[in-house]
Amino acid sequence: MKYIGAHVSAAGGLANAAIRAAEIDATAFALFTKNQRQWRAAPLTTQTIDEFKAACEKYHYTSAQILPHDSYLINLGHPVTEALEKSRDAFIDEMQRCEQLGLSLLNFHPGSHLMQISEEDCLARIAESINIALDKTHGVTAVIENTAGQGSNLGFKFEHLAAIIDGVEDKSRVGVCIDTCHAFAAGYDLRTSAECEKTFADFARIVGFKYLRGMHLNDAKSTFGSRVDRHHSLGEGNIGHDAFRWIMQDDRFDGIPLILETINPDIWAEEIAWLKAQQTEKAVA
């Protein structure tokens, strides 16, 4: 079964994220559990936790259908020790918040070398950061997101993701989230079914589908291989509809959150309905 949704706002309380997801007929959702542009947040209250869990239960969202995202400020591969420790502390806090909320996944951007250390050293720091966080938490899987490769961001090659996973001690609590826009901008073609087959054959060989724990379904304003991260609505960008139809008709993408981060929230309900309809099309065929 496909879990399809969007990254919804948690403004006014975390429980509102589940409510907003239900309003667009989503069967999955993503959210920030705190302000994504601040280092610190007030601890979660018992009331906030209880209300969130109650809303998820009311609208039938399990932890397998929810893909929280961490703060944009965190850089788990930071070359400067003091800044690295700050990021690690913030990441542990994000993991602990998920644990308190009964959430089993935390999606994050791997990190950046800032032109100060090698890619290899940065990837090793990211893996070490994950190990530290996993050691201090329970039941939450660290889900590494591929990047478009802007600036000095790592994670734009499947080999980067594999290298990080290789350095993580508890393989049962690490996974990846593939963002279609990021992959396309990083040079993984998705414009036809044949290109999708090739790209995900590479993914299966280098990383492995057993590590795929979520996806971000975004078309791309950015051009192929541009290393520029610019999302677009489904079918309106340079990827086109075929990739998303292909994903919806492939069983390897079942049972994980498939999350829209497309640019127009007003049409998320339509995009979700369209994605669901592609499954029906397969069943009829």
UniProtKB/Swiss-Prot annotation:
Q: Which residues bind Zn(2+) 2?
A: 145, 179, 216, 261
What cofactor does this one take? Zn(2+)
Q: Which InterPro entries match?
A: AP_endonuc_2, AP_endonuc_F2_Zn_BS, Xyl_isomerase-like_sf, Xyl_isomerase-like_TIM-brl
> What's the domain of life for this entry?
Bacteria
Q: Return the cofactor note field.
A: Binds 3 Zn(2+) ions.
UniProt keyword Metal-binding present: yes
Does the record bear Hydrolase in its keywords? yes
The EC code for this enzyme is: 3.1.21.2
User: Which CDD domains does the UniProt entry name for this protein?
Assistant: AP2Ec
One GO MF annotation is: DNA binding
The reaction(s) this protein catalyses? Endonucleolytic cleavage to 5'-phosphooligonucleotide end-products
Provide this UniProt record's keywords sorted from A to Z: DNA damage, DNA repair, Endonuclease, Hydrolase, Metal-binding, Nuclease, Zinc
Cite the NCBIfam families for this sequence.
nfo, PRK01060.1-4
Cited function = Endonuclease IV plays a role in DNA repair. It cleaves phosphodiester bonds at apurinic or apyrimidinic (AP) sites, generating a 3'-hydroxyl group and a 5'-terminal sugar phosphate.
Task: Name the chain's protein.
Answer: Probable endonuclease 4
| Name of the gene this protein is made from | nfo
